[in-house]
Regions:
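CBM-like carbohydrate-recognition segments
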Residues: 141-142, 176-211
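Active-site acid/base region of carbohydrate-active enzymes
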Residues: 1-19
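Extended ligand-binding clefts on enzyme/binding-domain cores
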Residues: 15-149, 160
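Inward-facing hydrophobic residues that define packing positions of alpha-helical scaffold repeats
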Residues: 28, 99, 170-171, 178
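Active-site-adjacent bridging/hinge elements
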Residues: 1-3, 124-131, 196-203
Length: 211
């Protein structure tokens, strides 16, 4: 998937990931019929993608969504598949169901969590560990870092689909998350729960200010 890891515990076990399948499908669809000589070509050197390959990817993608994979029940990476930049899902009901699950399970005041029980860059993460056992992932529940990046994905999608009320709401939310550096408004990679309020955030998710 987009996070370049295997299962949720990062044991290296391979999984099919909707974000990878969706990007591959979108890429093949974009390449189909491409003239390698560009606008000056005569059609003698065009890429022809077997439609069966695209159909297999479509079935695999629709079979996974709204999940990202077997171990990740929801993942913000799927926003890039159901909207900008891939727009890889034709089924509008599946698009809405996937978006609704991501917003419900992963949404927060500072953006979206990558996936549930994600310990990446939390204050309790052990950076010397390459993976965690499934029962150890509970220590990250409720304190997963939140990423403004995914609000930007949704903003671009909303603008391209001319959903202006939603675009304005997302723009307002993003503006509040920007930080000034050298006179520029920048967005941090993520917001995390400070060490001194980890227990309070675990008990009451969304109650503590992040940094």
């Amino acid at each position: 998937g987009i996070w370049e890891r295997g299962d949720k515990g990062n044991h290296g076990l391979p999984e099919r990931n909707a974000s990878s399948i969706g990007m591959a499908k979108a890429a093949l669809e974009s390449l189909d019929g491409l003239d390698l000589y560009g606008p000056h070509g005569n059609g003698s050197c065009r890429l022809l993608i077997p439609q069966g390959a695209i159909s297999r990817l479509r079935r695999a993608l629709e079979g996974l969504l709204p999940r990202e994979s077997a171990s990740k029940e929801a993942d913000s990476a799927c926003l890039s598949v159901i909207g900008y930049p891939a727009w890889a899902v034709e089924n509008s009901k599946l698009v809405e169901r996937t978006a609704r699950r991501i917003r419900r399970e992963l949404g927060g005041a500072y953006g979206y969590k990558r996936f549930l029980r994600d310990g990446h860059q939390t204050v309790v993460e052990d950076v010397s560990r390459l993976h965690y056992e499934p029962e150890e992932l509970a220590q990250f529940e409720g304190i997963e870092s939140e990423w403004p990046l995914f609000l930007a994905f949704e903003l671009v999608t909303a603008c391209c689909e001319q959903r202006w009320d939603e675009a304005r709401r997302l723009q307002t939310q993003l503006k509040a998350l920007a930080v000034e550096k050298d006179g520029e408004q920048l967005y941090p990679e993520l917001y995390l729960v400070p060490e001194q309020v980890v227990e309070q955030e675990r008990q009451h998710p969304g109650s503590q200010a992040r940094i």
